[in-house]
């Protein structure tokens, strides 16, 4: 009786077996497709300022990953679940260096790691820029000076061409394109920020992230030579926005604002705004001062690194009374 039922429904059974076979084939094909994607070389960039440049150089030839993204403060970032795996699968790890990635968990995985490309250290070794420091600590914010970051992109391209030679010609061509755009942006920034009246070229921000920017774009040749360019910028917090701000810090900035007749202070996108609001409210009677209409981006990006640089230049130029040139 059982075999009679089997014969009766054998066409149904055959159909089910055929369908199952299709699923198996489909699954295998899908697996092969995913495997192909996963087999691409993985490149890990520690932040978006690096990632956006590496991605432009490599295109889709590699799998690009960014570790610290969004509004997260890179100064205080501690590794989370999955970060160790991202580092393990990556052939190259680009970091900014100069003390930016200074948390204990990051140092543990970066220091002594043969896959790590420390951009700051490499540029210093090649005398690509003059290092700034505060209280004995190096200033890591080199990406705010497009002229310095051009050297970093050259270093990224050099490493990528050497490590992934099968795409060397393509990477070099992409790098030349991006470097040309960056040189145009640098010249544009110099010309636009030069339209700011000299008496207005004072930059007050949330933390000390714009020293390289100030030295490059808001100072005269004489000020850069003498070191007096440092008088062009001020902030209540140091290089890393982690420490508590004291009343003394606030009053120091207030005195600076009054001494230089500063009319506007700039918030930063990821920082607590209370300190600068207190500074504005503490300003002496008769000192007209306000918060800028738009925040600056220091340790993160708005859309991408290149648009962020343009945003900062436009915002500072317009707020300080200059004219943004096209």
UniProtKB/Swiss-Prot annotation:
A Gene Ontology biological process term: metal ion transport
Keyword field contains Cell inner membrane: no
Keywords: Iron, Metal-binding, Periplasm, Signal, Transport
Subcellular localization, as worded in the UniProt entry: Periplasm
Top-rank taxon: Bacteria
InterPro entries per UniProt: AdhesinB (IPR006129), Bact_metal-bind_prot9 (IPR050492), Lipoprotein_PsaA-like (IPR006128), ZnuA-like (IPR006127)
Chief location: periplasm
Residue sites binding Fe(2+) per the record: 75, 141, 207, 299
Signal sequence extent: 1-21
Any one GO MF annotation of this record: metal ion binding
GO CC list: periplasmic space
Subunit text: Monomer.
PANTHER family assigned to the protein according to its UniProt record, in alphabetical order: HIGH-AFFINITY ZINC UPTAKE SYSTEM PROTEIN ZNUA-RELATED, METAL-BINDING PROTEIN HI_0362-RELATED
Role: Part of the ATP-binding cassette (ABC) transport system YtgABCD involved in metal import. Binds Fe(2+), Mn(2+) and Ni(2+), with a preference for Fe(2+) and delivers them to the membrane permease for translocation into the cytoplasm.
Family classification: Belongs to the bacterial solute-binding protein 9 family.
Protein name, as recorded: Metal-binding protein YtgA
């Amino acid at each position: 009786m059982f075999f009679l039922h089997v014969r009766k429904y054998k066409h149904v059974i055959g159909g089910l077996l055929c369908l199952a076979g299709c699923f198996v084939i489909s699954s295998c094909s899908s697996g092969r497709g995913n495997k192909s994607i996963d087999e691409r070389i993985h490149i890990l960039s520690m932040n978006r300022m690096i990632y956006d440049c590496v991605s432009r150089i490599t295109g889709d030839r590699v799998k690009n990953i960014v570790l610290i993204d969004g509004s997260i403060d890179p100064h205080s970032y501690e590794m989370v679940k999955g970060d160790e795996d991202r580092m393990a699968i990556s052939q190259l790890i680009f970091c900014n260096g100069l003390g930016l990635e200074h948390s204990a968990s990051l140092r543990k995985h970066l220091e002594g790691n043969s896959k790590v490309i420390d951009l700051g250290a490499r540029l210093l070794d090649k005398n690509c820029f003059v290092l700034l420091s505060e209280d004995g600590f190096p200033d890591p914010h080199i990406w705010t000076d497009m002229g310095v970051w051009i050297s970093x992109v050259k270093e990224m391209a050099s490493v990528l061409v050497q490590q992934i030679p099968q795409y060397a010609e393509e990477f070099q061509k992409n790098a030349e394109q991006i470097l040309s755009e960056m040189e145009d942006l640098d010249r544009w920034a110099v010309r636009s920020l030069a339209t700011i009246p000299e008496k207005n070229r004072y930059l007050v921000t949330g933390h000390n992230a714009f020293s390289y920017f100030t030295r490059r774009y808001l100072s005269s040749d004489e000020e850069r030579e003498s070191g007096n360019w440092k008088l062009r910028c001020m902030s209540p917090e140091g290089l890393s926005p982690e420490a508590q701000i004291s009343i003394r810090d606030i009053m120091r900035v207030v005195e600076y604002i009054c001494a230089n007749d500063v009319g506007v202070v700039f918030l930063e996108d990821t920082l607590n705004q209370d300190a600068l609001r207190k500074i504005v409210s503490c300003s002496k009677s008769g000192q007209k001062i306000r918060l800028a209409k738009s925040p600056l981006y220091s340790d993160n990006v708005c859309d991408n690194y290149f648009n962020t640089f343009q945003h900062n230049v436009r915002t500072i130029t317009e707020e300080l009374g200059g004219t943004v040139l096209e």
